[in-house]
Amino acid sequence: MTRLFGTDGVRGLANKTLTAPLALKLGAAAAHVLTAGTRPHGRRPVAIVGRDPRVSGEMLAAALAAGMASRGVDVLRVGVIPTPGVAFLTDDYGADMGVMISASHNPMPDNGIKFFSAGGHKLPDEVEDEIERVMDDLPEEGPTGHGIGRVIEEAPDARGRYLQHLADAVPTDLSGITVVVDAANGAASVIAPQAYEAAGAKVIAIHNTPNAYNINEKCGSTHMDQIQAAVLEHGADLGLAHDGDADRCLAVDSDGNIVDGDQIMAILAIAMKENSELRKNTLVATVMSNLGLKLAMEKADIQLRTTKVGDRYVLEELNAGGFALGGEQSGHIVLPDHGTTGDGTLTGLSLMARMAATGKPLSELAAAMTVLPQVLINVPVADKSSIMKSANVQAAVAAAEEELGGTGRVLLRPSGTEELFRVMVEAAEQEQARRVAGRLAAVVAEA
């Protein structure tokens, strides 16, 4: 049986694979698993539910809320808000669980459901497996009368509490900095521009008018050409691009050059080391991070630990080691002292705070890391599980590694959220990386 949960919750085409009946069952099962510890104390459990603006979000939120209420959980719906906002509010309200309805950077027709436990923490694999198991075993009948949970619509102070948290986390004056913000017509629209303005920056917002259908449509962190052009047009100091649920942030310097998650981590790691905030002198990244990050950290005398791809695995390593900074090349940056998950707005504030503190432009700060040529090709496949078992693929990987020698690397991995297999190649020269990656991708496509 195929596992329902991927690397970032449950995702699928809304109303096709991710349906309201499925959301109802997920809500009931998650409520049963995640609130079991509160029952002996006689307290009614509470769940926080947020979403991004895509059209299917309201339908799925209603179904999830019904499922949780049917198991005796009071549901507080907080409306459109970033994923890290749900994580924060789950902790801030003292809730027993949180749910975010979003497919992040995926196209509008998709949607997803991700759960948080008490304290705003993402679930480990074994808890997700338990939720899946319970889905098939729960009886249709639940509590009756006073035992049924209530659904409370749109908590009026939720966004304000989250905005105050961001201001408290990065108490800095950004006066004199002009920033273009691409909100991806997503959840960032209701938070990021406001947070940056509150810190004193001059904000030029683009793709900031969600209408339920335009989320991620040729905008946001997966379409960086938009913000590159806007930064140059407005003569801004930088640009910050978010994804649909605002848990990631990529940047653009004043010359229109992209500053990716690896470079952002390098900037913040060096800053935190200078301020004695980089606990155990360690940065946590994933195997997808550019080799240039490792070299930059060696130069800065900072230890680099790597994990599997997915911010949940970065989080696990951060928590296990007691470290203070981690993230992904894609722009998921985690600062555990200020949040339990990646937070794009917090990342943007932290990056601008470093610019303000040093008086240096983003281009100069980003020069701390030299990005090695890297090519990533997403190959559509019918069966992700069979690719690495293919003798042809194994032979192609071995040949590629021999060609690259010690000046590059090869990484093949399945997407955790889509029917894709990712082929990544780094090399000393761009053309070599492109050639090797193209050859590998062709073999994967035929496997």
Swiss-Prot record:
Binds 1 Mg(2+) ion per subunit. It comes from the Bacteria. Activated by phosphorylation. The keyword Magnesium applies. The active site is at S104. Its cofactor is Mg(2+). PROSITE patterns: PGM_PMM (PS00710). GO terms for cellular component: cytosol. InterPro entries: A-D-PHexomutase_a/b/a-I, A-D-PHexomutase_a/b/a-I/II/III, A-D-PHexomutase_a/b/a-II, A-D-PHexomutase_a/b/a-III, A-D-PHexomutase_C, A-D-PHexomutase_C_sf, A-D-PHexomutase_CS, Alpha-D-phosphohexomutase_SF. Its EC number is 5.4.2.10. Gene3D superfamilies: Alpha-D-Glucose-1,6-Bisphosphate, subunit A, domain 3 (3.40.120.10), Alpha-D-phosphohexomutase, C-terminal domain (3.30.310.50). The modification Phosphoserine is found at S104. Signal peptide: none annotated. One of its GO terms (molecular function) is magnesium ion binding. Belongs to the phosphohexose mutase family. HAMAP family: GlmM_B. Catalyzes the conversion of glucosamine-6-phosphate to glucosamine-1-phosphate. This is Phosphoglucosamine mutase.
